[in-house]
Amino acid sequence: MKADVVIVGGGLMGFSTALHLALRGSRCVVLEKDSPGRHASGVNAGGLRQLNRHPAEIPLAVAAAETWHRIRELVDSDCDARFPGQVRIAENAADMDKLEQRAAQVQSLGYRHEELIGRDELYRLVPALAPHCVGGLICRGDGYARPFHALTAFRNKACSLGVHYQDSTRVERVEQSGGDWRVQSQRGEFQAPVLVNCAGAWANTIASMLGEPVPLTPGAPMMMVTERLPHFIAPVVGAASRKLSFKQMHNGTLLIGGAHLARLDLQHESTEMNWRKLAVSARTVLALFPQLIDVRIVRTWAGVEAFMPDHIPVIGPSGTAPGVYHAFGFSAHGFQLSPVVGRILAELILDGRSGLPVAPFSIQRFAA
């Protein structure tokens, strides 16, 4: 099959890229070795977070936030997005000092979306919080969406614009022939002058085929969800010195994460819950919300992510293979960035440059 662009990876990054290219008239094929959103894209915490981003990611996160607030214009769905804000809690003076330094750093870069709040404002926003906390850092425009709803919306919109999608299509070999990339899979050959690697935890397999392996480490962040409860909290909650992502969904369940990792068998694409680490996550919640001690956990899961050594992604052109572009390694915080990453790749492919700064994300930072 011949196309303008072949995209490897049927997650949010792959479909966002396909969508933005299709909006500008490109013929795209998306190849997914499993089912759409089987790994990171469909099972993450759904955080729409500008708060506490790596400085290099801030311009992208701010641009992505603007898109999420009008996401229906892009994908004909609101993706169940909600924006109650997100707050990092300071439990003591040392935590507050850390948050003050962070706020000063963000302001020095010219941004004002992260706001220090004192104890009174914190308890006005989160009255159920344990009484020992002293303040926080908030981004009032942050929130969350439903990952599988978002993935479905991006996929459906892309396909409505003519994007061809094939699941259960594992890429076995990539080679250049003339001006095209020939992508061999167990379901046939696909050809295009442009190849995009959005293969997530398996992106290094594709990058290695192209002669530019990267130090990508697969990992499987765990999540817990509770029984339904009466609503008692609006903002998404994190902590300055603990691993925590805590939110109450509109159906009353609590979604609890924090980057504790499951045991992962990448070869067999299976995960096993690490109950000791889940217990740490549960104790963190109880330290901040002790009234939840009798609440039942009803489900746990893990999704396979790609982690980079510097915890920021690879976005941009290949350093060795003309016509190849990468978007992977989002290190468990790529969901919010997905609309703008697709836009960036479309700009790089079609215009040769992007309106957003992408140099920090170059794959060449890992070149030997």
Language model feature labels by segment:
Residues 287-368:
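C-terminal catalytic lobe of FAD-dependent flavoproteins
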Residues 3-29:
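N-terminal Rossmann-like FAD-binding beta1-loop-alpha1 element of flavoenzymes
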Residues 137-193:
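Helical element adjacent to the flavin cofactor pocket in flavoenzyme catalytic cores
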Residues 38, 189-234:
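Central helical "cap/lid" subdomain
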Residues 46-125, 243, 284-285:
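Dinucleotide-binding Rossmann-like beta1-alpha1 core, especially the glycine-rich loop
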Residues 77-88, 113-119, 123-161, 262-267, ...:
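Helix-loop-beta segment of a Rossmann-like dinucleotide-binding subdomain
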Residues 228-323:
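Active-site lid/adjacent beta-loop-alpha segment flanking the redox-cofactor pocket in flavoenzymes
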Residues 22-42:
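Glycine-rich FAD pyrophosphate-binding loop
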